[in-house]
Amino acid sequence: MAKKLAVVAIGGNSLIKDEKHKTVEDQYEAARETTIHIADMIEAGWDVAIGHGNGPQVGFILRRSEIAAKTEGMHEIPLDVCGADSQGAIGYALQQTLQNELYRRGIKKPVATVVTQVLVDKNDPAFKKPSKPIGSFMDQVEAKRREKEMAWSVVEDAGRGWRRVVASPLPKEVVELEAVKTLIDAGAVVITVGGGGIPVIDLKDHQYQGVAAVIDKDFASSLLARLIKADLFLISTAVEKVAINFGKPDQKWLDKMTLAEAKQYLAEGSHFAKGSMAPKIEAIIWYLENGGKQALITNPENIGRALKGETGTWIVP
């Protein structure tokens, strides 16, 4: 049987079950539960590349950095390095829990994490309008000082204080693509484009430099799925299926959507929440418009059933 290749995108929030379960140990346990379902895919004959979010985790790293700088005079950690730190830590949790589960099932398959840079265009319009809040809240005095001394973009956030905002540019290329392909071809499960990848710009002739930005992890996974010619782009999220008219009396759960329907529902503007489902639908549209084969949205515990066509929302060209 010919192997089928899937890119599975996992949310950074899915490693944090609730407000009371945020520790590293809690996140490891959440990773273990998620990788059981990925092991089911592998046992069913899929090759898998895994992308993941890192929003809360980068927030924790930044907070530690800010506290250490304020209380001990330690140097602060740049945002691109925070991204690299989170790729290593989350990759380690996913890698080890998946390795353990595969070994328990008698499946011999290596698992590897690739610290991944993703190229963005230094002229992307997003750099002119930073909009992604990161880090802790500050008072106005501190915010304005950092704006002046460190060239930060800062905004007042809903009356709760001031925060730094950074750009969220579109991913253009996966710098480590050939390494990722080589590992997949050798039969490995690859954890890559973590947190959307570390955003880098090309100064000249493939001389890369990290930038303070955040790439949407679903868009980075969408790009990866396209570049490695995956048979499936699967977004693992908090809901079993996608709904239109979400939260309204005429709410309807969808088993299947065509690309045209997905674009129509998105354009109508009332179906998908801006910060949660809308970017996932946008990433899938981007994938299918550029030659992608099929996409699936479901929650981790239903991945096995969804692949059998029993649940989840399938999006097709």
What does each of the following model-derived ranges do?
Residues A2-P317:
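C-terminal catalytic "cap/lid" subdomain
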